[in-house]
Each structure stands twice: as C-alpha cells, then as structure tokens.
C-alpha cells in the first residue's frame, strides 16, 4: 500500500470503507476499498473465488479491479476511480431525466450485467450506489461478486438502501437464488430513474414485501408456488393487495418502458427476462444511438489528467461501420472500367464502353487482340505528323504524363500501366535530369485537329502534345536510340511492310493483315516511313522505323532477324525493363528462311560444335 497515497474517504459501505487514492508511480486516481473483515492468510483471500476472476473481467460498463493487496491482515481492493455514483446523480437532479437519458443509462447497466452473468457471476448487491458514473453518459457496475463471500451480518439499519432493491426470494430467505435477483434490482433502479425516488422504500424486510405487494398486487399461488413455500416456512402470509398500474405511478414512462419494468419486476424469478433478453426488448429498439457519448472522455480527463484512458466504449447499438467508398465512386469520369491488370493489354477508346465485353467473351467471339495498341480502321494521316490519343508507343514507354505525381492517375485510367512496370518509373526519373524527352501535356483546344471526334470525350489528363513537337526534339531521338535495340548492319528503314495495301482492323491483326503467320497466331512486321498512310496513327508516329523493344525477339545466335513477339504469347514471357541488354526477351526460335521475310538477309549462324556455343561466332563477327 506504500505505492498509493490515500487522499480522502469516499464512503463507508456494508463490508468496507472506500478511499480515494493516487498511484505514486503513475499519478492515476484510484478507489481503494478496505475490507472490514481481517484476512490472516492469502489462502483466505484466494478462497474468495471472485478475486482471481474479477481481475480478468474487462468491459466498458464494469469497474476494473486493478489489484488486490493484503497488508497487516487487511484486504484492499484497488479499483479505477469514478467521480460519482448513480445515487448522487439522481439526488442532485432538480427535474426528471428525459427518457432518452434513462434509456442510455439502462442499456449500459444491462450491458455490464449481461457481461457479468455470462462469466458466471451475479452481483447480489445491485443498487444506485454501486453504479458509478461520469455523468449520465457513462455508467459502470462496481463491487459485483464480492457480496456473497464477504457478506457479514450487519444490522440492516447500517445500509438501509440495499433493502429497496432486494428481490422477493431474497427477502423470503431463499437458499437458492441466482442472477434473476440482479434483474429485479435493475427493474427497481429503472423505476427510480423515472421517478427520482425509490419504488419500494420498505423500512424493514417485512415492510419491503408489503411495499412490493402494494404495487404489484398479491401474487397468486399458481403464479409463484415456490414463493408460497418460502412464506409458509417463515410463517409469513402475503397481504391481500390490488395491483397498481405502473403507468399511474410513472406517468412519464413510455409504454415500452412500463412493459420492460413489469417483466423485470415479476414475482417469479424464472419468468424474469435475463439481462441479454432485456437488451433485445422493443424499449431499446429505437433510432437513438445508445451508449456513452464522446464527451465523457473529455470530462474524465479534465477531472484527472493522469487518469488512465478509458476502456473501449460499449457498442450499445450495433452501429454498422461506414463502408469504404465503392470502387465505382472512385473511377467516376474514367474512360473505361478498370479490369484485372495485365501487362501490355490493348486500350479501348472510351466510345467502345457500351460495347466492350468481358475478357472471356472477347476470347470466345474475337481473335486474340494484338499486343499493339488499338489502331483505328482507315484512319487518315494527320497533318504534320500529329497523332490521336491512340498512339501506342507513348503508352508502352510511359513517356508522357501530366505531372510527376500523376502516376496513380495513369494507373487508374489503365493506360497500359501494370504493376510489373512500376519499377521503370524510377529509371525514367533518373534519366530525366540528363536528357529528358518528357514534356508536360498542354490542354488541347476544342477545335483542334489534334484528335478526331471519337476521342473528344477523353479527360484532359490524357491530352498529349503533337508528335511533331516530340519526335523532332534531339533529346527525344537520342533517348529512343538508347532505348531501342538497333543492331549493327541492320537498317530498319529499308524494310518493307507486308500486305501494305490491305485494310487494317484493330481486332483482326492476326487473320486479315497476315494470312500466313509464322507463329500460332502471330506474324512479323517491319515499318517504313513510306507505309505511314497504310498503318494509320502508329506508322505515322513511327517515322524512324523503330519497333518497340517489348515486342521484339532476338532470333538465332546474333539477333540477325528481328521478329515480332507471338501475338498469343503470355504477358509473363515479356518482363518489362527499360534498361538495354541482350537476351532480355526469351521465346521460341523461328525459321529464318520462312516466306514473307522482307528483311535484309544475313549469313546463317555457325552451328555449335558438340552442343557447345561458339561465342566467337555468335558475338565476335557482329560487334
């Protein structure tokens, strides 16, 4: 006890006195209950079966038993401190409580009581003095479970108020009683909250029974046979009384409140509702948010700055947590719904939103789309090399975006962005300081020929500058030269396009443009400036004949043939990486003597000897 400093006495109860104390270590205010009975060993203390369990009970409407101390044969219980009890709260009132306040108080009492009963305890001494509170917003049950073990036989005059809340079976000296006696006490306390005076203010045990009979009426033997047996064993005869309607005594109570009190104040303990059942009564099924308000935290802190933080408040009404904003709300204004992200997935224009089908349906009804960006059929060549928004190389290379922090915006719009490509942003940011081809887009005027009518609905965040401004910049050319996979001796400007005179459908690359494919669905393709009109926006942009590096495959020993990746290849075969290096993309090897290969012929690689790779033949002759 030398760890606590006693400050003043708070009260003197039946079984001990309560002192206000302060922890010397933390400065926290506590309530110290010093038991009147002496305990000469710890075994006697531990024989109080509640002592161990009470320390484990933790509920927002139950006073926490912090510590049990035995010193000089005296037993001390250290509780958390509350500034007042419900009796003081009612005594200081000069007008009746609103029913909403009473409902809130009652709900908290029943919440704590249901918790106690659930863990095998019942209070045995429920009364307003044992309901500690911080105003009407927070109520906690105190001193439960101690009464039975610490019960002495004091004169009833020592603590008169306890009698007013005793159940009839206790008054009739029943040897078997349980948690229903607490429910009876709660019903009496509820009536007192409405009236601000006790419902059964008996002056003795016999008078208490008379007071109960005056309100509830004389019980019938058929209604409570056990009660008549108890009365006969005490040579007691119930007075003959006519019941009084509780509504007459408590006019300010609602019909639901009268019904709940009538059920809890039943002569037969078996017919009383449990605390859990009482919580489900229609009296509590209202729109009111029950439970302690947030203000009680501030009031408790203002009372004692060092006071221990309150335990979590009870969820008296199962308040449904506010759901996270729907993903639909987050993508409002986006050109298309976000699907499962796949690397290098073609982007559909916003106008195709109404006819866009799920991926499974596309695979059933249409050939697999190419990894190239969507190309509009018969798109006319733009003057001055300007592009529509469907230029693919910008998306794949991620070289244009609105601002440095708009990466998430681009990902939300699903402009070819995938999780596997995010690391490339760090590489881009490092290179921007030296030779940055990136330029922030400017808003496109409504009357500009920058885009056709079909992509006018695109958000301003996707507005891009014309290609002529980007492709002619020296830094851009240097950057793309570094990023591309040009090989010595291969001039991509001299290659031609296969089937250049055929019409292009963005969904039928595999069967209209390339009747004879080298792979299962794919084909090879080379670009030239002379073919710009035939290939629409992509070839117009690709003036240098550059083939995007992620669509290349190096074939045979020295990359002598440049092939496009198979159109049906899985995305996992093409790991996104902006750094240049050889052997980056692995895939099947194609026959270099196949038809329709209008690429500069090179010498065939020297076959390996005995399964070993001839590195000189592979690299030495071309580097």
Curated annotation (Swiss-Prot):
GO terms for molecular function: ATP binding; metal ion binding; protein kinase activity; protein serine kinase activity; protein serine/threonine kinase activity; transcription coactivator activity. Induction: Up-regulated by dihydrotestosterone (DHT) in androgen-sensitive LNCaP prostate cancer cells in a dose-dependent manner. Up-regulation by DHT is transient, reaching maximum levels after 24 hours and decreases slightly after 48 hours. Changing residue 130 to H: In RP62; results in a complete loss of kinase activity compared to wild-type. It is an enzyme of class 2 (transferase). Residues 356-369 have a biased composition (Low complexity). ATP binds at residues 10-18, 33. Residues 4-284 form the Protein kinase domain. Residues 328-396, 416-469 are annotated as: Disordered. Disulfide bonds: none annotated. Changing residue 159 to F: Abolishes autophosphorylation and impairs kinase activity. Keywords: ATP-binding, Cell projection, Cilium, Cytoplasm, Cytoskeleton, Developmental protein, Differentiation, Disease variant, Kinase, Magnesium, Metal-binding, Nucleotide-binding, Nucleus, Phosphoprotein, Retinitis pigmentosa, Serine/threonine-protein kinase, Spermatogenesis, Transcription, Transcription regulation, Transferase. The active site is at residue 125. GO terms for cellular component: axoneme; centrosome; ciliary basal body; cilium; cytoplasm; cytosol; midbody; mitotic spindle. SUPFAM superfamilies: Protein kinase-like (PK-like). Its main location: nucleus. InterPro entries: Kinase-like_dom_sf (IPR011009), MAP_kinase (IPR050117), Prot_kinase_dom (IPR000719), Protein_kinase_ATP_BS (IPR017441), Ser/Thr_kinase_AS (IPR008271). It is found in: Nucleus; Cytoplasm, Cytoskeleton, Microtubule organizing center, Centrosome; Cytoplasm, Cytoskeleton, Spindle; Midbody. It is linked to Retinitis pigmentosa 62: A retinal dystrophy belonging to the group of pigmentary retinopathies. Retinitis pigmentosa is characterized by retinal pigment deposits visible on fundus examination and primary loss of rod photoreceptor cells followed by secondary loss of cone photoreceptors. Patients typically have night vision blindness and loss of midperipheral visual field. As their condition progresses, they lose their far peripheral visual field and eventually central vision as well. Interacts with RP1. Interacts with AR and CDK20. Found in a complex containing MAK, AR and NCOA3. Interacts with FZR1 (via WD repeats). Belongs to the protein kinase superfamily. CMGC Ser/Thr protein kinase family. CDC2/CDKX subfamily. This is Serine/threonine-protein kinase MAK.
């Amino acid at each position: 006890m030398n760890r606590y400093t006693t400050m003043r006495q708070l009260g003197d109860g039946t079984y001990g006195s309560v002192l206000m104390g302060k922890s010397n270590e933390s400065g926290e205010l506590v309530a110290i209950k010093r038991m009147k009975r002496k305990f000469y060993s710890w075994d006697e203390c531990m024989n109080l079966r509640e002592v161990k369990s009470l320390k484990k009970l933790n509920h927002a409407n139950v006073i926490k038993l912090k510590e049990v101390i035995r010193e000089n044969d005296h037993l001390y219980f250290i509780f958390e401190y509350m500034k007042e009890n419900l009796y003081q709260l009612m005594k200081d009132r000069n007008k009746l409580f609103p029913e909403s306040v009473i409902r809130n108080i009652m709900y908290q009492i029943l919440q704590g009581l249901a918790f106690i009963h659930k863990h095998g305890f019942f209070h045995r001494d429920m009364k307003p003095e044992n309901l500690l509170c911080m105003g009407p917003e927070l109520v906690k049950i105190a001193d439960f479970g101690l009464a039975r073990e610490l019960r002495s036989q004091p004169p009833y005059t020592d603590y008169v108020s306890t009698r007013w809340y005793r159940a009839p079976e206790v008054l009739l000296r029943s040897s078997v009683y349980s948690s229903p006696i607490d429910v009876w006490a709660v019903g009496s306390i509820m009536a007192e909250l409405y009236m601000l005076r006790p419902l059964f203010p008996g002056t003795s045990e016999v008078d208490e029974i008379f007071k109960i009979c005056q309100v509830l009426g004389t019980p019938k033997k058929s209604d409570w046979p056990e009660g008549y047996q108890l009365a006969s064993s005490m040579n007691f005869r119930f007075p003959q009384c006519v019941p009084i309607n509780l509504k007459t005594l408590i006019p300010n109570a609602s019909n639901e409140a009268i019904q709940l009190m009538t059920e809890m104040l039943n002569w037969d303990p078996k017919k009383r509702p449990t605390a859990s059942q009482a919580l489900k009564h229609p009296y509590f099924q209202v729109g009111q948010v029950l439970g302690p308000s947030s203000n009680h935290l501030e009031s408790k802190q203002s009372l004692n700055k060092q006071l221990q933080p309150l335990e979590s408040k009870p969820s008296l009404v199962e308040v449904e947590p506010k759901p996270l904003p729907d993903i639909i709300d987050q993508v409002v204004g986006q050109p298309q719904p976000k699907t499962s992200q796949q690397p290098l997935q073609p982007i559909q224009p916003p106008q195709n939103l109404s006819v866009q089908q799920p991926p499974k349906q596309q695979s059933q009804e249409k050939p697999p789309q190419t990894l190239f960006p969507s190309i509009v059929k018969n798109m006319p060549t733009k003057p001055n090399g300007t592009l529509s928004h469907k230029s693919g190389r910008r998306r794949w290379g991620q070289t244009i975006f609105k601002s440095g922090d708009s990466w998430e915006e681009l990902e939300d719009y699903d402009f070819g962005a995938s999780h596997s490509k995010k690391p490339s942003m760090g590489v881009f940011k490092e290179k921007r300081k030296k030779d940055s081809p990136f330029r922030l887009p400017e808003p496109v005027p409504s009357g500009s020929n920058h885009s056709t009518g079909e992509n006018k609905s695109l958000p301003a965040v996707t507005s891009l500058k014309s290609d002529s401004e980007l492709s002619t910049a020296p830094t851009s050319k240097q950057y793309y030269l570094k990023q591309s996979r040009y090989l010595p001796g291969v001039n991509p400007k001299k290659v031609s396009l296969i089937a250049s005179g055929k019409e292009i459908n963005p969904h039928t690359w595999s069967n209209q443009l390339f009747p004879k494919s080298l792979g299962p669905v794919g084909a090879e393709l080379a670009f030239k400036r002379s073919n710009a009109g035939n290939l629409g926006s992509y070839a117009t942009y690709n003036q240098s004949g550059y083939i995007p590096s992620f669509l290349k495959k190096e074939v045979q020993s020295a990359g002598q043939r440049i092939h496009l990746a198979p159109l049906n290849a899985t995305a996992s075969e093409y790991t996104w990486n902006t750094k240049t290096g050889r052997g980056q993309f692995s895939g099947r090897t194609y026959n270099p003597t196949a038809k329709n290969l209008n690429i500069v012929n090179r010498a065939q690689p020297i076959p390996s000897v005995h399964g070993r790779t001839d590195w000189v033949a592979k690299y030495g002759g071309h580097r």
